[in-house]
Amino acid sequence: MGSNSLSMIKVRLQNLFDNDEVALLKITCYTDKLIHLTNALAKAVIHTIKLNGIVFVHVITSSDICPNNNIVVKSNFTTMPALQNGGYIWEMMELTHCSQPNGLIDDNCEIKFSKKLSDSTMTNYMNQLSELLGFDLNP
């Protein structure tokens, strides 16, 4: 199959309620196939929901272990929270793919963080998402 290079998907996110707040989410793995990495990201990390014509990215899990360990070596969400524990809601701004054949990822692929939404704001959106998804996301 040949040797895999270290690849990373970097997702640039913007806080839904504060346009000045931006976060970068990254997931790293060894793979030659970008589609495997994007599929792993979509299945293990985030769900996207379209509201009023805008696609929002919702962090569903903060687990640092993804289901397909032979594809995903490491995923790093650091302080990105689980949605069911309060969570954040972001609008996706851009998605970047980083790859290094020497196994090193440069500093340009590091993460920045944004702030937590207020409890009342989050509850309001959780209720809307619960209706949209057809099940209750609130504890």
Curated annotation (Swiss-Prot):
- A GO BP entry: symbiont-mediated suppression of host cytoplasmic pattern recognition receptor signaling pathway via inhibition of RIG-I activity
Bilayer-crossing residues are none
What residue intervals hold the motif DLNP?
136-139
Q: Name one GO cellular component term.
A: host cell nucleus
Top-level taxon of the source organism: Viruses
Arranged from A to Z, the UniProt key words for this protein are: Host cytoplasm, Host mitochondrion, Host nucleus, Host-virus interaction, Inhibition of host adaptive immune response by virus, Inhibition of host innate immune response by virus, Inhibition of host interferon signaling pathway by virus, Inhibition of host IRF3 by virus, Inhibition of host IRF7 by virus, Inhibition of host MAVS by virus, Inhibition of host RIG-I by virus, Inhibition of host RLR pathway by virus, Inhibition of host STAT2 by virus, Inhibition of host TBK1 by virus, Inhibition of host TLR pathway by virus, Interferon antiviral system evasion, Modulation of host cell apoptosis by virus, Viral immunoevasion
Its annotated compartments are: Host cytoplasm; Host mitochondrion; Host nucleus
An example Pfam family from this entry, by short name, is Pneumo_NS1
Instruction: Report the family membership.
Output: Belongs to the pneumovirus non-structural protein 1 family.
**What is known about what this protein does?**
Plays a major role in antagonizing the type I IFN-mediated antiviral response by degrading or inhibiting multiple cellular factors required for either IFN induction or response pathways. Acts cooperatively with NS2 to repress activation and nuclear translocation of host IFN-regulatory factor IRF3. Also disrupts the association of IRF3 with CREBBP. Interacts with host mitochondrial-associated membrane (MAM) MAVS and prevents the interaction with RIGI. Interacts with TRIM25 to suppress TRIM25-mediated RIGI ubiquitination and thereby RIGI-MAVS interaction.
Q: How does it assemble?
A: Monomer. Homomultimer. Heteromultimer with NS2. Interacts with the matrix protein M. Interacts with host ELOC and CUL2; this interaction allows NS1 to form an active E3 ligase with ELOC and CUL2. Interacts with host IRF3; this interaction leads to the disrupted association of IRF3 with CREBBP and thus reduced binding of IRF3 to the IFN-beta promoter. Interacts with host MAVS; this interaction prevents MAVS binding to RIGI and inhibits signaling pathway leading to interferon production. Interacts with host MAP1B/microtubule-associated protein 1B.
Question: What domain comment accompanies this record?
Answer: N-terminus is important for IKBKE/IKK-epsilon reduction. The DNLP motif has IFN suppressive functions like binding to host MAP1B.
Q: Could you identify this protein by its name? A: Non-structural protein 1
The record lists the organism as Human respiratory syncytial virus
Q: What is the lineage of its organism?
A: Viruses, Riboviria, Orthornavirae, Negarnaviricota, Haploviricotina
